[in-house]
């Protein structure tokens, strides 16, 4: 039956049944609209699926629109049916189904269904048909981006038969059809803008993106799928770098926690010792007070008893004399003699009160200790929190250095031949910063650099070297231990560190790596290794090694260079200021290079440092090592 007639439903291609007129003027069967929008409801527009739209013109309906039967059109259809068999398209009973019928479309697959649903992966719930009755929905075969609904093979029939629906875009079943619509125009996303890298509908393509390079989504997907392997490879590399960075950060966190626990234990132990010393001093002072009190009380109480006894004897002798009868001369003489003897026995001066209590000076001694302790606590706290008085920063006291020496195993590993795995715990990923590269340096990604004869037109940058063929690594270092490796491919090269705030516009004689107090390096001059700092050079007797390890130790203010061979690390030179001997005598008074280190090297660590590289000869070429436990790959000369 031709579905283009004025009295036919564009969905089922049958004569209109219970006709409903939409605001745009198009007519549909009420049951067909209910089957097309089961998730919106047959009697209203809007809902969780988004704004309803006309299946023909795609005009959206206003929220809350109630679909009602068009009585005039219904009566016109009845009159048309009664005018004769030649005028009506079919018998009358087929035109008036019950309004309560859930759907006018068949609910079972027909033999002529356009396609069958593909099997879904095990354990995954398939997308259900939106036109099937609720509770008995079949798996969907396709989703319509125009109708915003999914259909099983049976309910896809109208999209195959109706000319008005054949232009709808059918895609494999989608769970969230709303994500395939333009949020602004509520139209299907069918185009891709390569300029702004967004998916567009036709309205967006004709308005905001006019003049941009627009391609179909399928074409862009095919192109992006070809690049997918490169993107995934880059993602894997970045994840590896992040994994190394995460491991390094975790080691730093663990180091901070362990150092804090150890320092907390040392402080608690020292405070306990100080408290024990104060407790012992308190016991001594209190004992001194008790001893002084007992001694002085013994003397005073003995004198008190003697005076009381003498007074008692005098009182008794006087009383006895007063009781002698006047006629008894013998008793009178005897009692008077006894009174005189008692008087003479105590007539000497007794000991007076003590002029000074010796134990009362105890409070003065304790007060002095308290005041000195308070002042010492304030001074030490200010020294602990305030900046150091010299450029070397906080240093260990000699007594603490003697009492708490550095771990011997770590010292031996850092200053002698050691397994490479030990240093990989401190691995740091170095990426070359193109904004610092001199115009005669060509970068290969972020890991390789080669000196060239023709200048490269780099963009202007305030951090770019202008007089020296140098380049820095990204990221500044200011604490902890860091290790990276450099592969010397060809030519004269230098590798080391440079202060972040060093001016890249310095002239050639002062701006080169190791020729100033703001940088130091290891140089390979084609014949031998040497180290440079503050304009002084110290030759090294070691043979050539194509792979050099660099270890920056902020805690010890040291920079070490190693030759890497077969998983072993051989120390080339460790740059560090020597500890002065007792009495202020320097450790190496006859070595000018070490003397320069002793006087200026620690000041380098007051700055944030960056990995630095200097390519001196015209054929110089180096590469940042991959820092993997497996053998380092041999790079071909470019």
Swiss-Prot record:
Keywords from the UniProt entry: Acetylation, Coiled coil, Cytoplasm, Metal-binding, Methylation, Nucleus, Phosphoprotein, Transferase, Ubl conjugation pathway, Zinc, Zinc-finger
Renumbered residue ranges of the record's region Disordered: 79-119, 300-322, 384-411
- Enzyme type, top EC level: transferase
Annotated GO MF terms: ubiquitin protein ligase activity; ubiquitin-protein transferase activity; zinc ion binding
Q: Which residues carry this modification: Phosphoserine?
A: 461, 588
Pathway given in the UniProt record: Protein modification; protein ubiquitination
Instruction: Quote the biased-composition stretches of kind Pro residues, using this chain's numbering.
Output: 88-100, 108-119
Q: Name one GO biological process term.
A: regulation of postsynapse assembly
Segments forming B box-type zinc fingers = 177-217
Phosphothreonine modification, residue list: 72
Tissue/organ expression: Low expression in most tissues. Higher expression in kidney tubular cells. Overexpressed in astrocytoma tumor cells.
**One of the record's GO cellular component terms:** cytosol
Q: Give me the stretches of Basic and acidic residues compositional bias.
A: 302-312
Q: Where are the zinc fingers (RING-type)?
A: 9-58
Task: Identify the PROSITE patterns for this entry.
Answer: B302_SPRY, ZF_BBOX, ZF_RING_1, ZF_RING_2
The UniProt similarity line reads:
Belongs to the TRIM/RBCC family.
* Biological function: E3 ubiquitin-protein ligase that mediates the ubiquitination and proteasomal degradation of CYLD.
Q: What is this protein called?
A: E3 ubiquitin-protein ligase TRIM47
């Amino acid at each position: 039956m031709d579905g283009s007639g004025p009295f036919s439903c564009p969905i089922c291609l049958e004569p209109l049944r219970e006709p409903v007129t939409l605001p745009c003027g198009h007519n549909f069967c009420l049951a067909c609209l209910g089957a097309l929008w089961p998730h919106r409801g047959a009697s209203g527009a809007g809902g969780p699926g988004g704004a309803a739209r006309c299946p023909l013109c795609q005009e959206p309906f206003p929220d809350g629109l109630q679909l009602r039967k068009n009585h005039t059109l219904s009566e016109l259809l009845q009159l048309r049916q009664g005018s004769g068999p030649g005028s009506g398209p079919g018998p009358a009973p087929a035109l008036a189904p019950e309004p309560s019928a859930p759907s006018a479309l068949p609910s079972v697959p027909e033999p002529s269904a356009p396609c069958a649903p593909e099997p879904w992966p095990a354990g995954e719930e398939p997308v259900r048909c939106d036109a099937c009755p609720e509770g008995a929905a079949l798996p969907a075969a396709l989703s319509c981006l125009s109708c915003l609904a999914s259909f099983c093979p049976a309910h896809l029939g109208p999209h195959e038969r109706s000319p008005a629906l054949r232009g709808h875009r059918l895609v494999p079943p989608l769970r969230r059809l709303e994500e395939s619509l333009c949020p602004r125009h509520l139209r299907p996303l069918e185009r891709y803008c390569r300029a702004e890298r967004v998916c567009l509908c036709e309205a967006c393509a004709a308005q905001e993106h006019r003049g941009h390079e627009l391609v179909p989504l399928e074409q862009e997907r095919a192109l992006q799928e070809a690049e997918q392997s490169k993107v995934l490879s880059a993602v894997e590399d970045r994840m590896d770098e992040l994994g190394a960075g995460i491991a390094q950060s975790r080691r730093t966190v663990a180091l901070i926690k362990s150092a804090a626990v150890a320092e907390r234990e040392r402080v608690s132990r020292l405070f306990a010792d100080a408290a024990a010393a104060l407790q012992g001093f308190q016991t001594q002072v209190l004992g001194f007070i008790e001893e002084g009190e007992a001694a002085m009380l013994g003397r005073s109480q003995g004198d008190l008893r003697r005076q009381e006894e003498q007074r008692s004897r005098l009182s008794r002798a006087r009383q006895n004399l007063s009781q002698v009868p006047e006629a008894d001369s013998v008793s009178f003489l005897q009692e008077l003699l006894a009174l005189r003897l008692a008087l003479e026995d105590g007539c000497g001066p007794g000991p007076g009160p003590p002029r000074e209590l010796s134990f009362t000076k105890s409070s003065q001694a304790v007060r002095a200790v308290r005041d000195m302790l308070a002042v010492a606590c304030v001074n030490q706290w200010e020294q602990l929190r305030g900046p150091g008085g010299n450029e070397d920063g906080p240093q260990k006291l000699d007594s603490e250095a003697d009492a708490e020496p550095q771990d011997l195993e770590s010292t031996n590993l850092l200053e002698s031949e050691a397994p490479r795995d030990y240093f990989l715990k401190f691995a740091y990923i170095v990426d070359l910063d193109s904004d610092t590269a001199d115009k005669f340096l060509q970068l290969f990604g972020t890991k390789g650099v080669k000196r060239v004869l023709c200048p490269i037109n780099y963009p202007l940058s305030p951090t770019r070297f202008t007089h020296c063929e140098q380049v820095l690594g990204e990221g500044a270092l200011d604490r902890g231990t860091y290790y990276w490796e450099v592969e010397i491919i060809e030519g004269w090269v230098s590798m080391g560190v440079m202060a972040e705030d060093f001016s890249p516009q310095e002239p050639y004689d002062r701006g080169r790596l190791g020729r100033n107090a703001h940088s130091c390096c290891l140089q390979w001059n084609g014949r031998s290794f040497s180290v440079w700092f503050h304009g002084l050079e110290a030759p090294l007797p070691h043979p050539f090694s194509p792979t050099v390890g660099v270890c920056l130790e902020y805690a010890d203010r040291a920079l070490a260079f190693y030759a890497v061979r077969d998983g072993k690390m051989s120390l080339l030179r460790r740059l560090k200021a020597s500890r002065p001997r007792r009495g202020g005598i320097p450790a190496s008074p006859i070595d000018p290079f070490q003397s320069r280190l002793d006087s200026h090297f620690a000041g380098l660590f007051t700055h944030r440092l960056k990995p630095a590289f200097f390519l001196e000869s015209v054929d110089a070429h180096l590469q940042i090592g991959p820092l993997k436990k497996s053998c380092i790959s041999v790079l071909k000369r470019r």
